[in-house]
Design a protein with these regions (language model features):
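Positively charged n-region of N-terminal signal peptides that target proteins for export
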Residues: 1-4, 249, 268-272
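Small-residue packing motifs within transmembrane alpha-helices
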Residues: 3, 10, 254-257
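Hydrophobic aliphatic residue packing
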Residues: 9, 247-248
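N-terminal signal peptide c-region/cleavage motif recognized by signal peptidases
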Residues: 13-16
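Hydrophobic alpha-helical membrane-insertion segments
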Residues: 126, 171, 258-260, 268
């Protein structure tokens, strides 16, 4: 039995299927359409678990922005979780600068946690991210941490965040994604996938089903693409929130996992 099939079987037998949470990179400025997108997030928050990533200027920005504060406060009041974007330069950015931006997010926007971007998965940088983890967890009461390497990491990275983003790429690359075996034994809430350039609602549902099969508890799927695929909400947003919030019937879920395993087995048997 190949590695992916084994992982799928383990994940199905070991984990309860539940509603997914949406992790939304809300990289739209709150004017014109941007205000509408933020209001759409707030409107959905009572019905589906949403974590929105606040990103005024590749970080909190040099000065407080009242437009961002207004939409952020409304989103939180509706029940959404708000986390602030900070880039780490793959472990090369000064810890002092990163910590200063973390401080500004809490002081200016009252965030519920931090989104660490450009996260290295190299062993020599583990201590860097453990230090940031300790700083956030020790310094703030609301201290949810999402770390985004955008790819696989060693298991030790679980100590750096509450959620690891282990995939951030276009849909064309998702079909070939195979999770590391160690992830199967973890709770699905520890992992997130961000998938863009997903053409329509049917393709979105397939992506979400696949994320479930990979033991992923947080997901975001969009038809946006280009240099910044996170500057709009998907045209199928309503369908996505409904599908993420729904809990699949056990029989249907078992059938999907079995079908995924069969497909992988057939692909692996093709002559090269």
């Amino acid at each position: 039995m190949n590695k992916l099939i084994a992982s799928a079987v383990i994940m199905f037998s070991s984990h309860t299927v539940s509603a997914l949470e949406l992790l939304v990179p809300a990289y739209f400025y709150p004017v014109d359409d941007g205000v509408t997108y933020w209001q759409t997030l707030a409107d959905a928050a009572p019905d589906v678990a949403i974590t929105a990533i606040l990103n005024p200027d590749s970080g909190p920005g040099a000065a407080f922005d009242s437009d961002y504060a207004a939409v952020a406060n409304a989103f939180q009041a509706a029940g959404g979780r708000l986390i602030g974007y900070v880039y780490t330069g793959y472990g090369a950015r000064s810890e002092a600068l990163v910590k200063a931006e973390i401080d500004r997010y809490y002081a200016q926007y009252g965030v519920d946690g931090i989104f660490l971007d450009e996260v290295s998965n190299l062993a020599q940088h583990l201590g860097y991210y453990q230090s940031l983890h300790a700083y956030i967890k020790g310094g703030f009461e609301r201290n949810h941490i999402v770390a985004n390497p955008g790819t696989q990491t060693p298991e030790a990275w679980l100590a750096t965040a509450d959620v690891l983003v282990t995939f951030e790429s276009p849909a064309a690359e998702y079909a070939g994604y195979a999770p590391d075996p160690w992830t199967a034994a973890q709770d699905a809430t520890r992992f997130a996938h961000l998938v863009y350039d997903v053409a329509d609602a049917d393709a979105m549902r397939t992506i979400i089903d696949t994320a479930r099969a990979h033991n992923v508890g947080h997901v975001y799927v969009t038809d946006d693409r280009g240099d910044n695929p996170w500057d709009t909400l998907p045209t199928y947003w309503a369908a996505e929130t409904a599908y993420a919030a729904a809990v699949p019937e056990p029989s249907a879920w078992a059938g999907f996992v079995a079908g995924l395993a069969l497909l992988v087995a057939r692909l692996r048997r093709r002559p090269r």
